[in-house]
Amino acid sequence: TERPDFCLEPPYTGPCKAAMIRYFYNAKAGFCETFVYGGCRAKSNNFKSAEDCMRTCGGA
């Protein structure tokens, strides 16, 4: 299956200041990594767990 286009987007912290640890798919590396998410205006390449991230974006 093809991965969704949003899996290629860079991580987006957003304008808020909550500093939550989330996961994004790093297309260059081929796996999911953590980033700091501010808590609002999430983009699609933002997952609560590495498992969800890999399930959505890692199985190309």
From Swiss-Prot:
Q: Which SMART domains match?
A: KU
Compartments, as annotated in UniProt = Secreted
Q: Where is the BPTI/Kunitz inhibitor domain?
A: 7-57
- Disulfide bridge positions per record: C7-C57, C16-C40, C32-C53
Q: Does the keyword Disulfide bond apply?
A: yes
Q: Name one GO molecular function term.
A: serine-type endopeptidase inhibitor activity
Instruction: Name the chain's protein.
Output: Serum basic protease inhibitor
